[in-house]
Amino acid sequence: MRNVTIVSMVALAAVLVFLPAASAQKLELGKEPGLEVPEVTAGPGWKTCPRCQNNAHIRAAREKYKVDGHAFDPRDLSGVWGNNGIQLDIKNVPPMTPYGNELWEATQAEQVRPEIPPMNGGQGSKDPMMHCDPLGYPRSFTYNYGFEFVHLPDRVVQFFEWGGYHRTIWTDGRKLPEEAPQLRWYGYNVGRWEGDTFVVESNGFEDRSWLDQDRRSMARGMPHSDEMRLVERWKRTSYGTLEVELTIIDPKVYTTPWTTKGTVDLRPGAELSEYWCVPTDSEEYNRDLVR
């Protein structure tokens, strides 16, 4: 029998459908008064996953691994980060083009029951995630799950716990394709260092994904087109802190580029686990919603 990890997302489906695969894990309630979020322990010799830690265990890990004041190389982003994925700054989203508005309206969740307001992630959802589509990028980062950076001589690989997805950021000097030969859920990515800032440029994205759920109403998603380009600026400001600036350039959907910023924390006492969207589980859950 699977155990459910309690997460901080509003989408109920994330709690009930996408379950950790390690059946041997057990839940332990936090020790601090009022702290009801459990940690999922992984067993002797194994680390827990970023989303499985409660605040007390996060603080304990920071002390155990001496995160504060630890020496670091600003040009090394290695480590497990999150699970505090950034939310896109919806308040600063520029006006959409007519085509963008058309895409946005099409994401509206359907009203299945009159007594329940429509919400993506619930009944009548249009969220691609509810059908086990890949989250794509940048949603895999803006979502509330951990990720890991691994440096190799000619690339940096970013692994995401949700769905087991990854993206390769090439640092071997290649250029982005002017015309992507094939659209990708995680795009084509090239990176370079500008001082201590890692700059990533991307294009060629599959347009069936969302940037994020529209958190102004929760009933719609933030769309993008296959012409979207991303520019990210990653900067490690301390051993335990990673700052990111994400700029979205999509003239087909948004009238001007827009930028959002965020900070993610190192999780030295964690390692990525499995967190899959299983189509058969998802179908069963969606059927239960309308019974």
Spans of model-derived segments:
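PEST-like low-complexity, intrinsically disordered acidic/proline/serine-rich tracts
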Residues: S23-R291
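Positively charged n-region of N-terminal signal peptides that target proteins for export
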Residues: M1-V4
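Bacterial N-terminal signal peptides
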Residues: V7-F18
